[in-house]
């Protein structure tokens, strides 16, 4: 008996777009996808579409 009681799991937070996190108007997720698909580099960092 571990005696943990009725512990509820944490509820998942509401999805927040990367554009709203960065305070931008253009779609950061879409730009990131296009950077990856466009063969611009082997690896694309998470901040690349924000600073572009």
From Swiss-Prot:
Major subcellular location class: nucleus
Where in the sequence is N6-(2-hydroxyisobutyryl)lysine found? 6, 10, 37
Gene3D superfamilies for this protein: Histone, subunit A
User: Where in the cell?
Assistant: Nucleus; Chromosome
Q: Which residues carry this modification: Phosphoserine?
A: 2
The chain residues annotated with the modification N6-succinyllysine are 10
| Covalent cross-link Glycyl lysine isopeptide (Lys-Gly) (interchain with G-Cter in ubiquitin), where | 14, 16
**InterPro entries with a match to the protein in the record:** Histone-fold (IPR009072), Histone_H2A (IPR002119), Histone_H2A_CS (IPR032458)
Q: At which residues is N6-acetyllysine found?
A: 6
Changes after translation: Acetylation is not necessary for the antibacterial activity.
Q: Residue ranges of region Disordered?
A: 1-25
The record's GO molecular-function terms, alphabetically, read: DNA binding; protein heterodimerization activity; structural constituent of chromatin
In this chain, where does the modification N-acetylserine occur?
2
Keywords attached to this entry:
Acetylation, Antibiotic, Antimicrobial, Chromosome, DNA-binding, Hydroxylation, Isopeptide bond, Nucleosome core, Nucleus, Phosphoprotein, Secreted, Ubl conjugation
N6-lactoyllysine PTM sites in chain numbering:
10
User: Biased-composition ranges for Basic residues?
Assistant: 7-19
Q: State if Lipid metabolism is listed as a keyword.
A: no
Q: Does the keyword Hydrolase apply?
A: no
Q: What's an example Gene Ontology biological process for this entry?
A: defense response to bacterium
Gene Ontology CC annotation, any one? nucleosome
Family to which the UniProt record says this protein belongs: Belongs to the histone H2A family.
Q: What does this protein do?
A: Core component of nucleosome. Nucleosomes wrap and compact DNA into chromatin, limiting DNA accessibility to the cellular machineries which require DNA as a template. Histones thereby play a central role in transcription regulation, DNA repair, DNA replication and chromosomal stability. DNA accessibility is regulated via a complex set of post-translational modifications of histones, also called histone code, and nucleosome remodeling.
Q: What quaternary structure, including any partners, is listed in this protein's UniProt entry?
A: The nucleosome is a histone octamer containing two molecules each of H2A, H2B, H3 and H4 assembled in one H3-H4 heterotetramer and two H2A-H2B heterodimers. The octamer wraps approximately 147 bp of DNA.
Stated name of the protein: Histone H2A
Question: Per the UniProt entry, what species is this protein from, by scientific name?
Answer: Hippoglossus hippoglossus (Atlantic halibut)
Organismal lineage: Eukaryota, Metazoa, Chordata, Craniata, Vertebrata
